[in-house]
Amino acid sequence: MAGTAGRQDDDRPPGDRARPVERERRPVERERRSVERARRPVERARHWRYEELPGVDLLRARYVHKTFVRHTHENFVIAAIADGVEVFHHGGSDVSAGAGALALVNPDTPHTGRAGVPEGWRYGAVYPSPEVVAAIAAETSTLRGAPGFVSPVLDDPATVRLVHEVLRAAEEGNALAADTLLRVAVTRLLRLNGGTLPERRPRTAGARTAARARAVLEERMAEPPTLERLATDLGTSPFALLRAFRDSYGMPPHAWLTDARVRRARLLLDAGTRPAEAAVAVGFTDQPHLNRHFARIVGVPPGAYQRERKNVQDSR
């Protein structure tokens, strides 16, 4: 037939004819996905102490998919966001801190944490103890009572830079700079966003019951009672205890217990206890159980946490 010279009819079904093209596309698609994965920010974190800053924990981190469950800290949280956005639940609502802002959490205040943008967030944080902050406040402010932060988010690039300079000085072993910059940063934060924390003395019958329940859980951390048994022993009902406990501590008893177990595990790890032994001592079933909860609260696995503590001790 005219116009068919040099062409052979392709008797294959249409689906089979397309397959060579699809095979050609696959390597290109795999390469594209590989490039996209390489461009994604890598999660990393270092949680450590510097012996010349007693009473202060330090953290540098980049998180993308990390989600921090509701938890508390015994120390203050002063987190300086370098880029990205962190969203955290605090005081009954979600708040966000972006680049140039600080996320500020007072001791024993329940909060969460997660990425507010697809690329996550990168930040540096210092965790000074209440005693450290109180000493700085007594010397540099007119605050009376226990000092703390009023707002959980403060846009202040100058203090963000100070916090990162504290971390850099600690990494370089510059004790004079680290101590000086920390004091300047805390003083500035108290001036811009400082206030007096309310007393935590239990004033209502429900609060007193919650405090008694907390004491029982601390004492029986490894083998806690059921909610019903705990309520019966305290002379109340399970739901009444649940409401009172949540009102007093911002989370139900079982969530508070997990948080408390991680806190105690940190103390054991600081003292040199092996992670597997620490897990059982605080009531977790095994080390993987501790690993999961520890990373969701502290931000790093217990093994990495302990190695940094050991490095500090070995350097003395």
Which stretches of residues belong to each language-model region?
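A short, Lys/Arg-enriched amphipathic alpha-helix from helix-turn-helix/homeodomain DNA-binding modules
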Residues: 152-164, 177-179, 196-234, 256-274
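Basic/polar phosphate-binding segments, predominantly the helix-turn-helix DNA-binding elements
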Residues: 215-218, 223-260, 279-308
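Sigma70-family region 2
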Residues: 112-116, 192-193, 246
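N-terminal regulatory/effector-sensing and dimerization cores
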Residues: 2-14, 18-20, 46-145
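Short, Lys/Arg-enriched N-terminal segment that forms or immediately precedes the first helix
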Residues: 63, 194-201, 243-249
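Long, intrinsically disordered low-complexity tandem-repeat segments
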Residues: 19-38
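Amphipathic alpha-helical segments enriched in hydrophobic/aromatic residues interleaved with Lys/Arg
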Residues: 139-199
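C-terminal edge and immediately downstream basic/flexible tail or linker adjoining helix-turn-helix-like DNA-binding
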Residues: 310-316
